[in-house]
Amino acid sequence: MDFYYLPGSAPCRAVQMTAAAVGVELNLKLTDLMKGEHMKPEFLKINPQHCIPTLVDNGFALWESRAICTYLAEKYGKDDKLYPKDPQKRAVVNQRMYFDMGTLYQRFADYYYPQIFAKQPANPENEQKMKDAVGFLNSFLDGHKYVAGDSLTIADLSILATISTYDVAGFDLAKYQHVAAWYENIRKEAPGAAINQAGIEEFKKYFEK
């Protein structure tokens, strides 16, 4: 199973943790966006959207990390704990995944990426939106050990990849009691946690320049 990725990428790390959780071995194919490797004709044949992560499972190509995570959990999961079959439980997992994609991760990117990649000054409005997003997550976790209920799901893995990226960026998670407690636990409990840690160390370099 080929996996086109960058180790520092939060979406890529989410997939790697999910693969670890279901016991799938990935054939890692480092894809350097800075060198334009995602624009090579052979990669465009696989993924015309030319983005990572991209998974190829016996000829079946899929991209968008959360779609890949649900695919791996459904096809290779030994049970439905990671991605429950119960419609309401699954709906909550989906909501958290979409929240991560559209709000939590997106607002991190909106605030930090212009500073990192375009050397622009910090935008206070985007900073507040980012803080609001972590506040929403804090509310979700009030009274719960995991982000989508009472057991670890792929939503925890996806959001761990994002929140650990917040952490290495220097965002103060201590102000969000439930997020901080969840993060302290999940970074030890999550399958593939060591892979995630190695990846965020790679991403951390962007904040040391």
Curated annotation (Swiss-Prot):
Q: What does this protein do?
A: Conjugation of reduced glutathione to a wide number of exogenous and endogenous hydrophobic electrophiles. Has DDT dehydrochlorinase activity.
For this protein, the record's SUPFAM superfamilies field holds: GST C-terminal domain-like, Thioredoxin-like
Q: What Enzyme Commission number(s) appear in the record?
A: 2.5.1.18, 4.5.1.1
Family the entry assigns: Belongs to the GST superfamily. Theta family.
Q: Which N-terminal stretch is annotated as signal sequence? A: none
Q: Where does glutathione bind?
A: 9, 50-52, 64-66
Question: Gene3D superfamilies, from UniProt?
Answer: 1.20.1050.10, Glutaredoxin
- Domain (GST C-terminal): give its ranges: 86-207
Question: What GO MF terms are annotated?
Answer: DDT-dehydrochlorinase activity; glutathione transferase activity
CDD domains in alphabetical order: GST_C_Delta_Epsilon, GST_N_Delta_Epsilon
**Lineage, please?**
Eukaryota, Metazoa, Ecdysozoa, Arthropoda, Hexapoda
Catalytic reaction(s) noted: RX + glutathione = an S-substituted glutathione + a halide anion + H(+); 1,1,1-trichloro-2,2-bis(4-chlorophenyl)ethane = 1,1-dichloro-2,2-bis(4-chlorophenyl)ethylene + chloride + H(+)
A Pfam family this chain is assigned to:
GST_C
- Keywords recorded for this protein, A-Z: Lyase, Transferase
Q: How does it assemble?
A: Homodimer.
| Domain GST N-terminal, residue spans | 1-80
Among its keywords, does the record have Transferase?
yes
The entry's protein name is Glutathione S-transferase 1, isoform C
